[in-house]
Amino acid sequence: VKTLPSLDPGFIPFGVWPKAYLKDADRPFKIAVERDHGKITVYETRLRGEAFAAANIRFAERRVKMLLWSAGGFRIYLQGDDTIAAQIRDAYRPGGAREFDAGFEFDMFERPLEVIICSEDDFPTANALPIRVGGHTNGCRIGFDAGGSDRNVSAVIAGKTVYSEEVVWHPKTSADPQYQFDGSVTAFKTAASKMPRVDGIGVSSAGTFVGNAPMVSSLFIKVPRERREEVKTIYDRAAKEIGDVPIVVANDGDVTALAGYMSLGTGCGM
């Protein structure tokens, strides 16, 4: 660190610390996270020697947490240091330091988070299973953006917007998911009325999704857990109010990335 902060001289930005840590790290350590449909993300890194035990667990635990939150999953595989792996496994157990993280992933995938200590032979291979979704410009389509303070809907014919509206709503304060459902249906029907037919619906929404189901979303933060099933099916049910219309729901960040791809004609843009 070139410049020490005067109010907290001991503070080290975490982006700087791993770079210094890895300079003398030479022991391979692998992390994999498994999520729905057998998708597996693998991250390979290195650890220092046993003399740096505290630094090793700090580095490895941060890498596991990063991978879990960036990829999501219900199963973590660790290989390379059984002692470090056991400490991480304990952290994700009930009462452990990462109990919150484990609970979040349970809400996402509805199964307890597992941490598995592997041998090199047992460690899984990466399985990205990429899918092509969205980007359609043909036909008559509805685009819906479910935001936390307003909702936006557009009617699009052959790639051209023929109608668009923005309506203020307050889903974050509603404990009854009927409010979010009714607002979505109203938006769909308004856009549908501007076109001769509806060939498909695309939804951009805050939250994390498995398929079209919002598993964790701030839009439903006040909805009690016992009404969770209503939330999970909310967009599919709303689409059925329009007819037998295909619908795809995605996180708003993923939709923004798709829009960037469509504008630039290439992926991996920042």
Regions found by a protein language model. Name each.
Residues 128-162, 269-270:
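Gly/Thr-rich phosphate-binding beta-strand-loop-beta motif of the actin/hexokinase/Hsp70
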Residues 1-127:
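N-terminal accessory interaction module
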Residues 49-61, 65-71, 87-118, 166-182, ...:
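Glycine-rich phosphate-binding loop and adjoining helix at the ATP-binding site
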